[in-house]
Amino acid sequence: MGQESSGRDALTRRDYLTYGGAVVAGEFLAGCASQAESGATPESTATDTATATATTESATSRTATADSYSVTMAPVGEVTFDSPPETWVANNGSWADMGMALGLEPPKAVWLTNRYHTRYYDGIDGVSVDTSEMVSLYQDGVSRELFYELDGDVHVIDPNFLVNRFQGWERSDVDEIAENVAPFFGNCIYAQHYPWHDDYRYYTLYEGFEKLAQVFQRTERYEAFEDLHDEFLSKLAPVVPGQGERPSVAVLWGVGDTPEKFYPYIVGGGTGFKHLRDLGVRDALAATEIEDFHGSRAAIDLETLLEVDPEVLMLRGYESKAREEFEDTVVDFLRNHGTASALTAVENDDVYRAGGLYQGPITNLVLTERAAGQLYDFDGELFDRERVAEIVDGAF
């Protein structure tokens, strides 16, 4: 981490708030006083490389003052807000996309901006986001100073992610930022394979989405998306063939545009696999001795992949490329490689982009529909794009 700046002693706008004890029994009061205002590995870290709408939801309890409210989410617990946050920082594109769905301004920062794939919005008229001022939290390390500079009203990040995934952070660093800047409120919902996830309480995409909607007091948008999602799943069901008719699929993170090494993924829980679970994907790696990358941090080579020989390759790490560019670079390399060209998926032109690690309610709709076409030759629309734009805009 960088050295502490001399400006650390200067008052932030939260110093003007009445905390009523600041931090009591793990509960943080989040004040919002201001009225203005493809890497080498899947995860590049130093260790592993509107208007608020009042609600009466049972999960949201009114405490502290007449206008304050509390929202509870594991592992952080209960967090009290005296008003809806106006600015925020998100861990990843899952949360950023949820914010988009709620009609929020984009987060000031995400872990890596190049992993928030806004290209998915291009096919939905009326839905777009300006990320020109968004910054990456990870910049050859994660500096506490950056959290002070960003000065968000809430950090939608599981603090355990910072402590366990980046060597430079301790619990005391998290406590400092929570007390002096803003609370943490988040869950590592995108994957469920980390060794530090023993006894971890996971949330589904829509459970996490509901919690975020409660934080920002925009539950009507959440409910509208939930209805849209139910309709989407009902349309998707007849698209998915019977188990015996589904091709075997291997999900891998390819290293570079000429991949001879791959990081394997077992299709499991987490938002990063929701589209594949909903499509009932038959996982070619699940029955092998190949371990999931999240737990092993190990790669496999083309020879090992050829032994498995899946019918379809779904490759991660290429979402910044359009389909044509992906095919002209990565797929073309595999077609002309001595070993890769023998893969059934390569021979049959069944090599596709797998979708990003981080999915929210909008991006999940887009990626699931795309994968339905890739895997099951579906040609059509599974969700109402105009309705998505209406919900984002607050038109119910």
Task: Put a short name on every predicted segment.
Residues 262-296:
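Alpha-helical, coiled-coil/dimerization segments enriched in small aliphatic residues
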Residues 293-301, 308-320:
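Internal helical hairpin/lid segments
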Residues 86-171, 175-176, 180-183, 284-287, ...:
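A short, structured surface patch at a secondary-structure boundary
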Residues 114-120, 162-170, 185-209, 244-274:
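Extracytoplasmic ligand-binding site segments that recognize negatively charged/polar headgroups
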Residues 199-203, 315-396:
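Structured C-terminal subdomain patch of bacterial secreted/periplasmic proteins
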Residues 85, 161-164, 194-199, 211-220, ...:
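Second-shell loop/turn segments in exported
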